[in-house]
Amino acid sequence: MKNIKGPAIFLAQFMGDKPPFNSIEAICKWAASLGYIGVQIPTIDPRCIDLKKVAESKTYADEYKGTIESCGVKITELSTHIQGQLVAVHESDNFIFDNFAPKKLRGNYKARTAWATDQVKLAAKASKNLGLKAHATFSGALLWKTVYPWPQRPLGLVDAGFKELAKRWIPILNAFDKAGVDLCYEIHPSEDLHDGVTFERFLKATGNHPSVKILYDPSHQVLQQLDYLQFLDFYHPYIKMFHVKDAEFNPSGKSGVYGGYQDWIDRPGRFRSPGDGQVDFKSIFSKLAQYDYLGWAVLEWECCIKHPEQGAREGAQFIKDHMIRITDKAFDDFASAGTDAKLNRKILGI
C-alpha cells in the first residue's frame, strides 16, 4: 500500500479579481498559508499559466515550476476541463458553449474544435515538461441529450456516438501516451463519460487506449445515486486523480435526480464543502490506500451555501484528517510463529 499525497487544492474556483486571488504567485502563497502543499492549475486562465510557452520551452517550464514551488506548493496536475468540453459539442449546444472559447473563434465551430484539440495536446507537452504524471479534462458530449431514452434512441446511435467521440480523442490520447502522462476524464453529468458504463464504452471505442484514465469525484456520483464506493472496486486501476468534493441528495415528493430546473440551493442534489455533505470520505480514503492510489487528494470547492474562503480553510484540515499513514507491519505480528516448514507440514497433517 502507498501513502496518498496531499492536501492540495484546485485553483479554478478561487481565481478572482482581487488579491490574493488575481495572480498565480499570490494565490499559491495563500494556499500554502492554509496548509496546502499542492495546487492543481486550470490552463484556461492566462493568469495561472502560459500553456503554450510551458509546452514549447523546457527552460521556461522549469522556471515556472520553480516560481510555484518558491510559493510553498507543488504543481499536482494541470486541467483542461473547459477545452476538453469543446472537443465534442453537440450542434444544438454550440451557442451556449461558445463563451468557453476565445472571442475570435466564437461562431466558427470547426475552428473552435481544432483550437480545443490543440489546447489539450499542448497540455500533454506542458505536463511532461513540468514532470507531471496525470492530467484532468472533460470528454465533451455528443450523446448527452439522449441520456433519457425518449424518444426512443435509434439502433446503433450509442455505438456511433462513442465511435465519433473516440475518433476525436485518439489523436489527443496519442499525444499523452507519447508524453508519458495519463489523461484523466472527470466522470461527470453532462459529459458522455458520466458513469462506469459510459467510461467502459469509451475505453472500448478507443481500442483500450493506455492513456485513458479516470478523475474520481464522488460528489457527481452521489447526485446520480451511483454507488461511489463500489466504483472504486471496479475502476481503481484507472483512477489516477481524485477530487475531494462533497455532496448531498435529499429527494422529495416534488423533485429528485433531475432537479426540476431549480437553482443549486433548492435542488435535491447539491454540492457541499467537505464534511458538510453525505460522502463517506473515511471509506474512500481507506479504499484508495488499499488499492495503492499514488496520486493527490485535491480539494475542489463547489458549495452553494458556504463561503469559498471558509471552505478552503476547512478543506486543508479535512483532507489532513482523512489521510492514512500506511502501516509497515501486520497488527498481529507480535504473535507471529515465524517461518517453519516442518511446523507447516504438521499443521497440514502431511
Predicted region positions:
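Acidic/histidine-rich catalytic cores of soluble enzymes
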Residues: 3-7, 11-12, 22, 38-39, ...
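The substrate-binding groove and active-site-proximal loops of carbohydrate-active enzymes
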Residues: 15, 49-55, 105-114, 159, ...
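Acidic (Asp/Glu)-rich catalytic clusters
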Residues: 2, 27-35, 55-77, 93-94, ...
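Active-site acidic/histidine proton-transfer and metal-coordination neighborhood
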Residues: 25, 29-30, 69-70, 85-213, ...
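C-terminal helical cap(s) of enzyme catalytic domains, especially alpha/beta-barrels
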Residues: 308-331, 335
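Short beta-strand segments at enzyme active-site cores
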Residues: 39-42, 75-80, 132-140, 182-186, ...
